[in-house]
Regions:
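Positively charged n-region of N-terminal signal peptides that target proteins for export
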Residues: 1-4, 308
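Sec-dependent N-terminal signal peptides
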Residues: 6-8
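N-terminal signal peptide c-region/cleavage motif recognized by signal peptidases
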Residues: 13-15
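Beta-propeller blade termini and top-face loops
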Residues: 19-574
Length: 574
């Protein structure tokens, strides 16, 4: 069973053990958003150059939001659409009322939500229509022709967990009524970034990336067919740019690139490769490249981060996004940290207003943040209820508290009713566990919260303590980033925790015992659905085959169900 990712925490949590009840008992209840109001991963970021106060952000599982006051407030404009997973947003330069949205997270991860194609608005985001490419599933980037809003190019990543034909570069010339695949390599190689030459829309660049997310936590971030390509005839034909860049022999993976508006022959690239990775520069429109910086802080983890942008009016000023953001003012020779307040990490996307370059928009793991003065001050991201939540739990106190693991921010909790009625970002607290945590409040003591793998948090003292089984340190037992943790509903003293075996403690983690054998397959091989693209990483990754779901009977303390991530379901009655 895959993770369920929630855009909002819901006040009412329906547990797996809930009995069927009459709708008459709850039909008058209404959902309300209670946060959290610190956002999670955001990768779509764009503004309108001629309307410098207007911005659009695309959230991995939160849809599309619009701000008309430089990020002070955000309003959802995509809630009535069938997907909340967004990879990119593009506004037509010639008619800013025309907006295209590419769905799917546009990332490479073991836990993501796929999309169902491209959406279009012709009224500034008030209404939307679906315009195709359903089975691309992951759209990394889309761009709109500078003078013709009906011409759009899409960089399609394709299926994240297996091969498919819907990968590569797609083009429409009629506003999305029909699409043509204009560049395709194979069933495992997708496109993740595409850009126009700023002065000639007949010239395009695209990064083709051969990669695949395997089952469990194992993945391949490079393949023989990855590379940077260029078209000079509007996308009809393409050639690979290789002079000076790493290739298949060097384990080339993802390439992120930026083009100078003021000097289109100047390109920068952040190149992820097992050998010779780094920041590269071209001064002849990509025909040749030079390695100018090897500092891994700038390009490391290139499968996750590959953002590099050039100042619109100065080709020597360049920004790159990685775990942190960095800036260079000497053509990429030297760099220093350039962060958006209030901090945060994992900088996925940067949009710079081409007419007012002091206006910049970062999309990061904590949401959207905007500066209007070149980075001196930034807007808050504590106004964006777009978080990705792993699991939801409630306790027994009054008013009851709601807990969960928030992507990129750790495990958190809040009372279901604020002191002033409305719940704000100030009401949420960290509870000392990780972002993927299943959270288990103690049924007998609401001040004790268990979470993750496994921390015990005391709300009164604010202290956290690791109470995981000591035997886990031996390396004998398998764990993934999110694992089941729950109190047995028929025995408030019994805390259950799943690895590849099921653990039980009756005293808050002071002593643990194993109550099951290994419930997973002996040989969890890579499934045939992965296709021919099997790499050493996929075959040798150790963290696979765990108990992924546990449910206990509220009527019988001896009855427990367990499901594994390699497709098995078990039950015990003793």
């Amino acid at each position: 069973m895959r993770h369920f990712l929630f855009t909002f925490l819901l006040v009412i949590s329906f547990g797996a053990n809930a009995q069927t009840v009459s709708k008459n008992l709850y039909q008058e209840l209404k959902y309300r958003s209670i946060g959290p109001f610190r956002a999670s991963r955001t990768v779509g970021a764009v503004g309108i150059p001629s309307q410098p106060n207007v911005f659009f952000m695309g959230v991995n599982n939160g849809g599309v939001w619009k701000s008309e006051d430089y990020g002070r407030t955000w309003n959802p404009i995509f809630d009535d659409q069938p997907t909340g997973s967004v990879g990119d947003i593009a506004v037509s330069p010639s008619n800013p009322n025309i907006i295209y949205v590419g769905s799917g997270e546009g990332l490479h991860r073991p836990d993501l939500s796929v999309g169902d194609g491209v959406f279009k608005s012709v009224d500034g985001g008030k209404t939307w229509s679906h315009v195709g490419l359903n089975d691309v599933q992951q759209i990394g980037r889309l761009i709109v022709h500078p003078t013709n809003p009906d011409i759009v190019f899409v960089a399609g990543l394709g299926h994240p967990y297996g091969p498919n034909e819907m990968r590569g570069v797609f083009r429409t010339t009629d506003g999305g009524k029909s699409w043509e695949k204009v560049f395709y390599i194979n069933r495992n190689t997708g496109a993740i970034q595409i850009e126009f030459d700023p002065t000639n829309p007949q010239i395009l660049y695209v990064d083709m990336w051969e990669h695949q997310e395997g089952p469990w936590e194992n993945a391949a971030f490079s393949g023989d067919h990855s590379g940077l390509f260029k078209s000079t005839d509007g996308g009809n034909t393409w050639k690979q740019l290789t002079n000076g860049l790493p290739g298949a022999a060097q384990g080339l993976g993802r390439i992120g690139f930026g083009i100078s508006n003021s000097n289109p022959k100047r390109l920068y690239a952040t190149v992820d490769a097992k050998q010779n990775g780094g920041i590269y520069r071209s001064d002849d429109a990509g025909e040749s490249w030079s390695l100018i910086q090897t500092d891994r802080r700038l390009w490391g983890r290139g499968g996750d981060f590959a953002e590099i942008r050039v100042h619109p009016k100065n080709p020597d000023i360049v920004f790159t996004g990685n775990v942190a953001a960095y800036k260079s003012s000497d053509g990429g020779k030297t760099w220093w940290s350039f962060k958006g307040a209030p901090g945060g990490d994992d900088y996925h996307r940067l949009w710079i207003n081409p007419e007012h370059p002091d206006i910049m928009f970062f999309a990061v793991d904590q949401g959207a943040t905007i500066t209007v003065n070149g980075g001196k001050t930034w807007s808050s991201w504590l106004n964006q209820p777009t978080s990705q939540m792993y699991h939801v739990a409630t306790d027994n106190q009054f008013p009851y508290w709601v807990y969960g693991g928030q992507q990129e921010s750790g495990a958190i909790g809040t009372a279901s009713r604020g002191n002033g009625g409305q719940i704000s970002f100030r009401d949420w607290i960290g509870i000392g566990s990780d972002e993927y945590a299943a959270v288990a409040p103690d049924p007998k003591n609401p001040d004790l919260i268990y979470g993750g793998r496994i921390m015990r948090f005391n709300k009164k003292t604010g202290q956290s303590q690791n109470v995981a089984p000591e035997a886990l340190r031996s390396g004998k037992y398998r764990m993934l980033r999110t694992l089941p943790l729950l109190f047995h509903p028929a025995d408030p003293n019994m805390l259950l925790f799943g690895t590849n075996v099921l653990w039980k403690t009756m005293n808050g983690g002071e002593k643990w015992e194993i109550i099951s054998p290994d419930l997973t397959r002996k040989q969890p091989e890579v499934p045939a659905s992965v296709g021919d693209f099997k790499t050493e990483e996929m075959e040798t990754m150790r963290q696979r085959a765990v108990i992924y779901a546990v449910s206990a009977s509220p009527l019988d303390v001896n009855t427990i169900w367990a499901g594994t991530d390699d497709g098995l379901v078990h039950i015990t009655n003793d």
